[in-house]
């Protein structure tokens, strides 16, 4: 039996598709025997024209997220090691704006979780829908590699999310 001692990939209520507060995550992690808990809620993106994503926290929620995680890190420092991160896609068109915005906060790590080709508002394909088109798989890999090449990401999360169902040749 292997016991997981660390989890660096967690999402809270702020991303709008997960449940639970940060405190609930910490308490469950301690109960489950985790030694390290990394928060990596879905990062906001500074999309134009007031576009509001339904799958990530809003820009105005970042400060509350950071303050909450840092307070829990201090409160539970004898019980569990807590880290502050974000899961974010690599959208080249908006990347510099995002990094500039996030640089005001003490994030320890970013997880690359690429959910769309192109970007969320001009998406070519949402990765969870699957495809048999090999050119989309190549674009997905190229976009992930470009994100990794920024040097900002700790790791690539769920690369299988793309759901390529085409010829494996």
Features from the language model and the residues they span:
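Charged, low-complexity, helix-prone segments enriched in Lys/Glu/Asp/Gln
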Residues: 61-65, 69, 95-103, 136-141, ...
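Short, hinge-like loop/turn segments at secondary-structure boundaries
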Residues: 55-57, 100, 128-129
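An N-terminally biased module of ancient metal coordination in phosphate/nucleic-acid-related enzymes
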Residues: 1-92, 155, 162-169
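Short aromatic-enriched loop/helix-cap "lid" or pocket-rim segments at secondary-structure transitions
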Residues: 50, 97, 123-124
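Domain-core and long-helix interface of multi-subunit machines
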Residues: 16, 104-107, 111-169
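Short amphipathic alpha-helices and their capping/turn segments at secondary-structure boundaries
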Residues: 21-35, 93-107, 139-152
């Amino acid at each position: 039996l292997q016991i997981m001692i660390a989890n660096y990939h967690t999402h809270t209520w702020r991303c709008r598709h997960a449940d639970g507060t940060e405190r609930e995550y910490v308490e469950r992690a301690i109960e489950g025997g985790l030694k390290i808990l990394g928060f990596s809620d879905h990062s906001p993106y500074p999309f134009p024209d007031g576009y509001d994503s339904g799958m990530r926290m809003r820009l105005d929620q970042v400060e509350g997220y950071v303050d909450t995680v840092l307070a829990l890190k201090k409160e539970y420092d004898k019980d569990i090691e807590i880290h502050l991160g974000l899961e974010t896609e690599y959208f080249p068109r908006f990347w510099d704006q995002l990094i500039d915005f996030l640089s005001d906060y003490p994030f320890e790590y970013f997880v690359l979780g690429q959910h769309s080709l192109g970007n969320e508002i001009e998406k070519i394909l949402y990765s969870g829908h699957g495809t048999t088109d090999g050119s989309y798989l190549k674009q997905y890999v190229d976009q992930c590699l470009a994100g990794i090449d920024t040097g900002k990401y700790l790791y690539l999360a769920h690369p299988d999310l793309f759901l390529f169902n085409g010829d494996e040749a």
